């Protein structure tokens, strides 16, 4: 009897894990990595999309960490505060013309509207890089980077897709403005995610 119970538990766990397996994985396409758990979004014209503020609290700050220069730490701290906002704003702007019924950014504690698709995620990396290396070593050295991971869920909390996206900035021989590039990259990532969602909803290629 005990063996039968254990077998049943193992079977249930296996079925549960199988149900979570993506039906398709796409790398270096619309985003760096996309895992789809459903083939498409049904009737997007009737669907509201919301984006929650991406969590930046656990991001790897690179040269903006506690051992970095004060200027880099300040840039990283500013990005932790402002990055989620500018990402969400660009995401919303990208989808305002469709194909969804509507799109808006939620505040941190705001409730999700009934029936809405939810985009949420976190900043994995917010690295200002090294301005000195960019200045003296030139192209490719001391590059800054911003990376996020996230998911798209339906109103019941079921995961429809997961994604990863990273933007890297070198800024050339002059060294460049690390904070300006980080903010620009956060906006670009918001746009990238919005375009991915639009292409997926329109059943266009994500490769």
Question: Where is each model-derived feature located?
Answer:
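Surface-exposed short loop/turn segments
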Residues: 21-23, 98, 106-158, 170-177
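A structural motif corresponding to the C-terminal end of an alpha-helix
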Residues: 87-104, 155
């Amino acid at each position: 009897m005990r063996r039968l119970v254990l077998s049943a538990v193992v079977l249930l766990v296996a079925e549960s894990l199988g149900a979570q397996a993506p039906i398709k994985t796409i790398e270096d396409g619309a985003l760096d990595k996309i895992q789809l758990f459903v083939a498409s979004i049904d009737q997007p014209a009737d669907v509201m999309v919301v984006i929650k503020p991406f969590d930046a609290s656990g991001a790897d700050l690179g040269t903006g960490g506690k051992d970095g220069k004060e200027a880099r730490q300040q840039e990283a701290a500013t990005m932790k505060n402002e990055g989620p906002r500018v990402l969400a704003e660009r995401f919303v702007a990208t989808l305002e013309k469709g194909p969804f019924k509507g799109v808006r950014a939620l505040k941190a504690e705001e409730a999700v509207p009934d029936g809405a698709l939810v985009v949420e995620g976190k900043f994995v990396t917010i690295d200002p890089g090294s301005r000195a290396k960019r200045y003296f070593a030139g192209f490719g050295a001391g590059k800054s980077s911003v990376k996020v991971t996230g998911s798209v869920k339906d109103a019941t909390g079921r995961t429809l897709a997961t994604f990863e996206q990273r933007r890297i900035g070198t800024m050339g021989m002059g060294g460049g403005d690390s904070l300006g590039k980080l903010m620009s990259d956060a906006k670009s990532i918001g746009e990238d995610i919005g375009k991915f969602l639009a292409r997926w909803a329109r059943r266009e290629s994500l490769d």
